[in-house]
């Protein structure tokens, strides 16, 4: 990954970590505990830090919530989590989750993985949503089953698949839905990846590296309080965390697709 790409990705993440997004989205499963008891909503992570083994639910949230490091008198988290890990509510006698996963909004299925073993996401689905401010992409990962196909139109609440534990580093006890809401970085991603990658790209432009995660957690909390929210206005009203200098001749597709980021 080039320094330019890293800087752009960091800037976009910072710009998007704001408490309002402007679209009335549904929660993707029957788990509604986010608003009253988040410890029952987020799936825990296993943590071994300074000799203590814990299972904090906070590690399932969006943002820098993983890989704690002690820096002097404080603890900082080095790993960014780009989505929300949602606990299942239903399991069969063997403990296998049964929860239905549904589209958060109307859209078109953009991508469904062919197999579960070619990504850390496991089996995942991407749905494109067009709300008049550039295309947004919701992503649903670690699914046991997918019930839709690419190109299929879906409505808010349409069943997409079944919650599972596919993907690396996840076992039955930590089964969960990883859900994201993303911006699309570049249609030239495949060429960029091929020029420097040492492993194959099995997912084309819907590789997770080409999707920039928004703060979906903050959106749901803000929407719960005030459904009348506007993403472009919220971004313009937010203080910039980074300023990135880009050569004038550079072609930045993300700004063409989402001019309200400026």
Annotate the PLM regions:
Residues 96-98, 102-145, 172-178:
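Zn2+-dependent peptidoglycan hydrolase active-site motif and core
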Residues 9-17:
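Bacterial N-terminal signal peptides
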Residues 23-123, 202-262:
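Surface-exposed, glycine-biased beta-strand/turn segments
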Residues 118-128, 142, 152-227:
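Conserved, short, structured surface segments that act as functional micro-motifs
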Residues 104, 148-149, 154:
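Surface-exposed strand-loop junctions at beta-sheet edges and helix termini
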Residues 1-10:
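Bacterial N-terminal signal peptides that target proteins for export
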Residues 18-22:
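Sec/Tat signal peptide C-region and signal peptidase I cleavage site
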Residues 80-93, 134, 141, 181, ...:
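Small beta-barrel nucleic-acid-binding modules, principally OB-folds
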């Amino acid at each position: 990954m080039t320094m330019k790409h890293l800087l752009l990705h960091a800037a976009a993440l910072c710009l998007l970590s704001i408490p309002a997004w402007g679209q009335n989205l549904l929660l993707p499963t029957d788990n509604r505990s986010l608003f009253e008891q988040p410890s029952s909503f987020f799936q825990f992570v296993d943590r071994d830090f300074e000799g203590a083994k814990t299972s904090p639910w906070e590690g399932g949230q969006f943002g820098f919530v993983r890989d704690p490091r002690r820096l002097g008198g404080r603890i900082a988290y080095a790993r960014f989590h780009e989505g929300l890990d949602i606990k299942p509510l239903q399991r069969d006698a063997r403990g296998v989750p049964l929860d239905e996963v549904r589209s958060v909004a109307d859209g078109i299925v953009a991508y469904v993985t062919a197999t579960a073993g070619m990504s850390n996401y496991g089996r995942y689905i991407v749905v494109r949503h067009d709300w008049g401010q550039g295309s947004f992409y919701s992503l649903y990962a670690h699914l046991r089953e997918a019930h839709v196909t690419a190109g299929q139109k879906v409505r808010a609440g349409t069943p997409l698949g079944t919650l599972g534990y596919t993907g690396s580093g996840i076992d039955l006890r930590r089964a969960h839905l990883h859900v994201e809401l993303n911006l699309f970085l570049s249609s030239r991603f495949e060429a960029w990846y091929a020029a420097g990658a040492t492993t194959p790209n099995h997912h084309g432009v819907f590789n997770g590296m080409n999707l920039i995660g928004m703060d979906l957690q903050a959106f749901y909390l803000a929407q719960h309080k005030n459904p009348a929210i506007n993403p472009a206005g919220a971004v313009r009203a937010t203080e910039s965390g980074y300023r990135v200098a880009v050569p004038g001749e550079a072609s930045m597709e993300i700004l063409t697709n989402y001019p309200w980021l400026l």
